[in-house]
A protein has these predicted regions:
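A glycine-rich, hydrophobic loop/mini-helix early in the fold
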Residues: 41-104
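C-terminal accessory module of base-excision DNA glycosylases/AP lyases that mediates lesion recognition
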Residues: 1-37, 90, 98, 102, ...
Length: 249
């Protein structure tokens, strides 16, 4: 299986779990809002619970504020042709997000960690639509969560990983300096070429990861989950056989 075939497979699988009732042929305002609402849930739900605050009354304000930004990028009305273009866009969206939440009484959620998660996950959801101009998302960042972080810990710079470990690998608490160092390091790792195992039982089955970090996310997000389940199952099976006095599985 090629990386493109695997990406197509994982995108379709992701769409079935997320948007069964959505029409993925039309990236209209309603669907863009849906992408943002799901991204906000990914970014803010846990922080809102811990901070005892509610952000959902602001959903319509947030979606209306960012709608045109995301539509213009996803449809390539706004061209993103260089890495610097995306970095400038990211910073504009980040500043707008932080300002909007802070000015509406949600200072506890006005954190960089939440902003980067909202931006990156929105682009991931947008990528799923047929009329999204995917080449315009080629410089997007890797969304950070438990599974993509597990992947990064296998391949990333040890010094940067140690800094991340100091905050318990909590993406919500990441600062801008560490975040940018991680994203730059991921670019460096991918540029060297990674043949990534895609079969838990047979690690020799591998696929070359692309340079597009959203596409990488679709692959490793699912595979790392499978790895986790597989390794836990092996551990339980070994424990069971050990108790029976059987040396080999």
């Amino acid at each position: 299986m090629t990386s493109n075939e695997l990406i197509d497979f994982e995108v379709e699988h992701f769409k079935q779990g997320w948007g069964r009732k959505l029409c993925f042929t039309n990236l209209n305002a309603s669907n863009v809002d849906n992408c943002m609402i799901h991204a906000l849930s990914d970014a803010l739900n846990q922080g809102a619970r811990r901070g005892s605050v509610k952000y959902k009354p602001l959903l319509s304000l947030i979606t209306s504020t960012f709608r045109s930004d995301f539509i213009e990028v996803a449809t390539a009305v706004k061209k993103i042709t260089t890495k610097a273009d995306f970095e400038n866009l990211f910073n504009q969206l980040k500043n707008k997000f932080l300002s909007l939440l802070a000015s509406n009484g949600l200072t506890v959620l006005s954190k960089f960690g939440f902003a980067q998660k909202f931006i990156n996950m929105t682009f991931k959801y947008l990528y799923c639509f047929d009329d999204c101009v995917k080449s315009n998302l080629q410089f997007c960042h890797l969304p950070l969560d438990q599974y993509t972080i597990d992947w990064y810990k296998q391949y990333g710079n040890k010094s940067i990983i140690s800094r991340f470990k100091a905050i318990n690998f909590a993406w919500a608490n990441i600062d801008e300096d560490l975040y940018w160092d991680i994203q730059e390091d991921i670019d460096l790792v991918l540029s060297g070429g990674i043949d990534y195992p895609i079969n838990c039982k047979d690690p020799s089955q591998k696929v070359r990861l692309p340079n597009n970090k959203i596409e990488v996310e679709f692959i490793v997000w699912m595979q790392q989950q499978l790895n986790d389940v597989y390794n836990k199952s092996l551990s339980k099976l070994k424990d069971y056989y050990d108790r029976l006095g059987i040396e080999e599985i």
